[in-house]
């Protein structure tokens, strides 16, 4: 029997998603809790492996088990066995052919910036603090040149192991609400550090250090050395993973916190 779970977590104290020796990971904590509930060792697969310090409200995992448990055992039971910064949002039995990563058709991330002179004490690990003056409208304008299918080598980490740098970005919106700036981006898949590298480059435009047209120029150059720095991990959230509708997986509010599902000026997508 194959089970899919929707997971959210605060990644602040974890060394990323993937299980590693001698450091804590989100995968390790979930597998330990699942193994207790199932009464056998459990190995999980996820939709997207997040880096150290990165959060998720819409991570999806799957695992195989022959343990016959009610839905409440997987949700309430798991949440009582997980640390406070990891939680299950939903559970669904799926076909054996379902795969959390390979069945997905798109991923969506949000990057949350706290743009204020002084750092925040509340939610400090859930946002990235930038004190410089930032124009979110300029960031949004520049980001539109990234829409469509492109070679994103410029925004790819050196250690990225993907076979191809080509990705299809279907939505990118940058908006401001008071001191908070949110970059909302959706694509069929993402390269390692792609969202954080895009954010770091758009921030240079928002700070007036580069013109709007610069983003299109560095994208075409396919050279990581020409782009901006990698933005900090703390503001990044995996908020949604798309799957074919016939799978019937639950749809939950994206978040984080108060953020609406639709970006300003759009309908849901």
Swiss-Prot record:
Gene3D superfamilies registered for this protein in UniProt: Pseudouridine synthase I, catalytic domain, C-terminal subdomain (3.30.70.660), Pseudouridine synthase I, catalytic domain, N-terminal subdomain (3.30.70.580)
Q: Give the Gene Ontology MF terms in alphabetical order.
A: RNA binding; tRNA pseudouridine(38-40) synthase activity
* CDD domains linked: PseudoU_synth_EcTruA
As its record notes, the protein acts as a catalyst of: uridine(38/39/40) in tRNA = pseudouridine(38/39/40) in tRNA
Please list the residues that bind substrate.
109
User: Which Enzyme Commission number(s) are listed?
Assistant: 5.4.99.12
Keywords assigned by UniProt? Isomerase, tRNA processing
Q: Which GO terms describe its biological process?
A: tRNA pseudouridine synthesis
Q: What SUPFAM superfamilies has UniProt attached to this entry?
A: Pseudouridine synthase
Residues of the active site are: 51
The text of the family note is: Belongs to the tRNA pseudouridine synthase TruA family.
Protein purpose: Formation of pseudouridine at positions 38, 39 and 40 in the anticodon stem and loop of transfer RNAs.
Its assembly, as annotated, is: Homodimer.
The protein depicted here goes by the name: tRNA pseudouridine synthase A
What's the source species for this entry?
Aeromonas hydrophila subsp. hydrophila (strain ATCC 7966 / DSM 30187 / BCRC 13018 / CCUG 14551 / JCM 1027 / KCTC 2358 / NCIMB 9240 / NCTC 8049)
Taxonomic lineage per UniProt?
Bacteria, Pseudomonadati, Pseudomonadota, Gammaproteobacteria, Aeromonadales
């Amino acid at each position: 029997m194959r089970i899919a779970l929707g997971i959210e977590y605060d990644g602040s104290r974890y060394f990323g998603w993937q299980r590693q020796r001698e450091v804590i990971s989100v995968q390790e904590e979930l597998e330990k809790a699942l193994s207790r509930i199932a009464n056998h060792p459990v190995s999980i697969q996820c939709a997207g492996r997040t880096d150290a310090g990165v959060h998720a409200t819409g991570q999806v995992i799957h695992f195989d088990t022959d343990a016959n448990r009610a839905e409440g055992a997987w949700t309430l039971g798991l949440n009582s066995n997980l640390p406070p910064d990891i939680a299950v949002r939903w559970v669904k039995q799926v076909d054996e052919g379902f795969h959390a990563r390979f069945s997905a058709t798109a991923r969506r991330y949000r990057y949350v910036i706290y743009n204020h002179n002084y750092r925040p004490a509340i939610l400090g690990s859930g946002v990235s603090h930038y004190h410089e003056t930032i124009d979110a409208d300029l960031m949004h304008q520049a980001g539109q040149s990234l829409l469509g299918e492109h070679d994103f080598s410029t925004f790819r980490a050196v250690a990225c192991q993907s076979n191809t740098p080509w990705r299809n970005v279907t939505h990118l919106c940058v908006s401001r609400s008071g001191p908070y700036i949110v970059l909302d981006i959706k694509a069929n898949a993402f390269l390692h550090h792609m969202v954080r590298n895009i954010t770091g480059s758009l921030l240079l435009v928002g700070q007036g250090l580069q013109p709007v047209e610069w983003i299109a120029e560095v994208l075409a150059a396919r050279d990581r050395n020409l782009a901006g720095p990698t933005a900090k991990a703390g503001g990044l959230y995996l908020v949604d993973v798309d799957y074919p509708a016939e799978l019937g997986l639950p749809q939950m509010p994206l978040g984080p916190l108060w953020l609406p599902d639709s970006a300003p000026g759009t309908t849901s997508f």
